[in-house]
Amino acid sequence: MAIVLPQGRFNNSTDRYIRNFIAERCRILAVVGLHCNTFKPHTGPKTSVLFVQKWDDELCPKVDNYNIFFATQRLEGKNNSGDKLYWIKCGNGTTTDPKDAKCDIYGHPIVYHDLFATVDYDCGDGKVNKKIQQTADGIAEAFIEFAKKEKLSFFR
């Protein structure tokens, strides 16, 4: 399960009871800090995504000491006005104009972020013939490696 929370819920001493409540019931898998522009223009507070897995005797046995994945989004995805940023077609940089943006194989402009890699697959005959990576690996790919290393139940 994933929950988007204001950053203060992770840091404020007065919110310790919330953190304790969650930790008693779930394994904290990851905390991913989102860029402050993520929810603009509608809201501006810094937020993070908390990923948890409910304690379960079979799938997620309770342990007292375990590793947690931490990451921070560095590529904003939106500018200060809340307009989406796209990877520019040629060269490095960004644009707010989808017409000038790098696109995936379906013609969708690729948003400028580092949450996950944008990968196109050539599946002409129903099988993957070729994998074309449009953007670098991101936070999701790093989490997958972490989950495999930690032998989490959903990546065994």
What are these regions (language model features)?
Residues 2-156:
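A conserved structural/catalytic subdomain of Rossmann-like adenosyl-cofactor enzymes
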